[in-house]
């Protein structure tokens, strides 16, 4: 996972959260990572952990919506977000409540930030 961190760090700082989010989505959706690799990814994300977790949340919601949650998505959710895949997917739904543009920030970005903040703060929907 050090190679992932190096590749992301090669981009401008303004793009890194988006890239960490993509790494989280790929890890949780596609699978194929060992527990050690997932732990390493979490550590490597460092200050970008909320963005990584938001990508994981997108994967969990996508798999839930398709009715194909699986063990690797569950494992990644538990390691990165410290919650079950169902709980993480529910956070994406809760973050849609009263969603709108905020001072020129597009609604999609507001949604992403809400997910990041709710996961970082340990917010649950149950």
Can you annotate each of these PLM segments?
Residues 1-126:
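Mature, well-folded catalytic/scaffold domains that follow N-terminal targeting or propeptide regions
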């Amino acid at each position: 996972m050090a190679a992932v961190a190096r590749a992301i760090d090669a981009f401008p700082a303004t793009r890194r959260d988006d890239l960490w989010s993509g790494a989280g989505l790929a890890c949780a959706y596609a699978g194929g990572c060992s527990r050690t690799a997932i732990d390493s990814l979490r550590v490597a994300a460092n200050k970008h952990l909320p963005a990584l977790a938001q990508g994981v949340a997108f994967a969990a919601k996508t798999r839930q919506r398709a009715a194909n949650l699986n063990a690797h998505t569950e494992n990644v959710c538990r390691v990165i977000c410290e919650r079950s895949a169902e709980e993480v997917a529910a956070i994406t739904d809760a973050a849609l409540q009263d969603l709108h543009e905020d001072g020129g920030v597009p609604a999609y970005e507001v949604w992403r930030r809400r997910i990041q903040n709710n996961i970082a703060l340990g917010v649950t929907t149950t």
